[in-house]
Amino acid sequence: MISFRQVEQEDIVSTKYEVMSGKILRYSPDGAALVNSEMDAYWSSLYEMQNPVADIRGDWAVIADVDGTSMKIFDKDGEAGSVTTSYSIVKARISSNGLVAAILDGGDSTWINYYDSDGT
């Protein structure tokens, strides 16, 4: 039987926090939210990722599922785009205008793909 305290602790361990637009980007394998210091949400977005890693530049963030194939792109107002890649994501970086560069592992080849802020 899992107690509430154990579930709360697991959530804290899997949740990460980064500064974005002077606020806090809170993200986990289940979703992301931009919150203030009281944890009141400006926006939230649900997704499923095994190993989410965020990169932030100014008002833009990308959350990539490292070793997976999905990325979510956010600005200060919420989700701007979504990407599903053909190969496993090694690393993703975002520019201050929302352009995403991703290194993908294609087995015998390594790819660097670029995506606009809407995921195209």
Where are the language model's segments positioned?
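Domain-scale macromolecular recognition modules
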Residues: G31, V35-N36, S44
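Short, positively charged
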Residues: D11-S14, N36
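Short coil-to-beta transitions that initiate beta-strands within beta-rich domains
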Residues: Q6, D11-I12, W43, E48-N51, ...
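Short beta-strand elements that form the blades of beta-propeller/WD-repeat-like
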Residues: T15-S28, A32-A33, P52-V66, M71-K72, ...
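A short beta-strand motif characteristic of beta-propeller blades
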Residues: I2-Q9, M39-L46, D77-T84, T120
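Short, intrinsically disordered, charge-balanced linker/junction segments flanking boundaries
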Residues: N113-T120
